[in-house]
């Protein structure tokens, strides 16, 4: 059985990490690595529903992984902690 790989920042410290959430956060983080954007753009890039993306963006913001810029529409970007990826050293 193949083990799924998730973005290292998809794991949350204060909440239970279930597979569906890890998958969604991985898609959101991968979309943000390509460039910042508003919730609608990120939802389209990640192929997720807008409300799912917004829920996970708020969770990631509470962990300090993403930040939201002021203005309409709000633009989401990765923070310094969000840009740091773990390197696999096999």
What are these regions (language model features)?
Residues 81-90:
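Conserved segment of winged-helix/HTH DNA-binding domains
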Residues 21-22, 70-76, 81:
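Short, Lys/Arg-rich nucleic-acid/phosphate-binding segment
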Residues 48-61:
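Short amphipathic alpha-helical interaction segments
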Residues 25-32, 60:
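Hydrophobic residues on short alpha-helical segments
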Residues 61-70:
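A short, conserved structural fragment
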Residues 2-27:
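Short alpha-helical segments that sit at the start of domains
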């Amino acid at each position: 059985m193949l083990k799924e790989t998730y973005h290292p920042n998809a794991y949350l410290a204060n909440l239970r990490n279930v597979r569906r959430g890890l998958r969604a956060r991985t898609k959101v983080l991968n979309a943000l690595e390509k460039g910042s954007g508003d919730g609608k753009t990120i939802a389209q890039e990640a192929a997720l529903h807008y409300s799912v993306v917004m829920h996970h963006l708020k969770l990631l913001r509470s962990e300090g992984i993403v930040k939201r810029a002021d203005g309409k529409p709000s633009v989401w970007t990765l923070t310094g902690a969000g840009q740091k990826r773990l390197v696999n050293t096999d």
